[in-house]
């Protein structure tokens, strides 16, 4: 992907991949589309041999289901593919709990910077579609008053 050539040319301390890192929506048990998307991206990354760390979180397309939430029955298999692709170590907390949310703390010019990666897929309840999509004040999805529903799993 040409964008990665531009990114590689920069002098970066860290690069954040904030989701939709691959496009592999899958409904088949074997997640072939998602596997193929990760394989293709791995080839891109291997060619570039990045010389800076990359941290990542997923969104719907690397989760495996367009606009998916907690209802996606293949989310744990998708998570395994994500962890494997990003080479997340076995002692990382993400390997032992639901979801991929995490934080990193980086020191930069004498200051600590905390970066939070929110998993807005694993725990998210179904969205309530608008009754009049496109109308002013009727965005694609509207708030739902049930406070027991979650996005972050708490």
Model-predicted segments: where are they?
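Metal-dependent phosphoester/phosphodiester hydrolase catalytic core
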Residues: 1-154
